[in-house]
Amino acid sequence: MSKQEHRLVEEFLTGQMSRRELIRGLMAAGLSVSAIGGLLASTGVSTRAEAESLVEAQHATAKKGGTPRFTTLVPAADVDPVTLFNEGAIFTAQICLEYLCFPRKDYTLEPKLATSWHSSQPNTWTFNLRKGVKWHDGTHFTADDVVATFDRLTDPKVNSAALSAFKGILSKGHVRKNNSHQVTFHLDRSYVDFPYLVSAFTYNSFILPKNYKAGSFTKGRIGTGPFVLTKYTPKVGATYVANKHYWAKGLPHVAGIELKYYSDNTAQVLALQAGAADVLLDMPYQGSQAIFSSPDINVLSIPSSAYRGFHMRVDQKPFNDKRVRQAVAYCMDRGALVQGLWHGFALPGNDHAFAPIFPTSVLPIAHLPQRHQNYAMAKKLLAEAGFPNGFKATLTTENFLEIPQYAVFIQQQLKPAGINITLNVEDQNTYYGAGANQPWLQVPVGIVDWAPRGTASQLVGPAYLCKGIWNSAHWCNAAFNTHMAAYDKELNLGKRKHIALQAAKVMYDETPSIIAYWIKELRAERKNVHGLAISSFALLDPTGISLS
């Protein structure tokens, strides 16, 4: 029995999942009907005959056929898996491409093109690859494809959107083929959470054919996933058909998928309400309230590590004094923010990057006092920093989801302390820019939408380490870097929790960014939709979807 199979059976035996969920998990792991029957019989879950009957029933209850219609935002540019960065492009690729592993809703990892992985030491990781997998053109998936994929992503000349995620951790040429279905990653430094970097939490880590050419994805028939891209129309959408040779037996259930692009969330909501769409994949609360009362629609909610970083440039006055940054933090009414912007579909943050969903966040959450609005403290800190009458600043951000409303909230909350904020809201492409013109990395004060990450290291690395490529606060703290380096090396979970507390204390005290809330992600489905995997709703695994 593999580690994955053992874990699934153990979760069933301890009451953490139903028999139906157990069988679905084993099917997703690629086991055949007879293999599942034998496994469940050998572990005493049921007899072989009972188990095989249950598996067949599981398949039978999922109605075959139909074409579910998904909605997402228009991709910023033509979709290429190596360079994509926004939601619409990510979903377009995730329907037909696969990763080595994929996150579950509790942020544990499910094997996909890798069946297992292990580390002999924190800087060396070996992955065993799934056998019998074919590309959509009929050729066989092998270790050569995995080596080529990560050489491509880590090549500075390629301009991969994942280059920043792998910087300082994995370099080009450091993935070795051991045999046709096993590879070893030789890391630049110890990184205990490395499997998350090759999962869907690094969007661009799609496994592509060894001979992949930039710009060829939208021509179709590239991937190993449950659906095959057959048509892509810029600004309009994409069409997929079921992969008849998919490696997971009995899947997919539906005949295909239609992905439709919309200009904004309002248009997506209207399409779902009108019956022109079946699933709104990643839904903000603001602008979607009408859906919650619809009798034909289910709204799903899960906790996540997604947040909005309200950063302050620590290398520019007045934010070069941490007392000013702390004063700003004490102006924020986080409870009102969670209720007003999210109607409770968020959790209060406390200005450190250890999200409640991470296992190592227990001690930071327990031991760091939750900040609450305290104007007396804010004014005291401002006076000590030399700003008894407050100051003026311009907050620049993007016109995306609830962020403009959040900016107005900040403006209103800071005013009683004498901090007068002027708002500058730009479209997304302008705000993030390119090359030497990237306002979000240059403005003195800004808000950034941070998508969910699988671990604290993934979240912290690009944004808060001294050499972080997306360090919009321009914050560099030697103690924090030292703590995170120790965190990345430590295998013992208990010890990691204590290191996390030390790192969180530094960030909490320094306050380079205000993390006022952690988002509970939302997805809306018509009630005839079943089986769509629940992971982070910023990610998509459509394998098990069916329609009734």
Task: Pin down the residues of each PLM region.
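N-terminal lobe/hinge region of extracytoplasmic solute-binding protein
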Residues: 71-121, 151, 220-224
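Structural transition elements
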Residues: 227, 347-384, 402-405
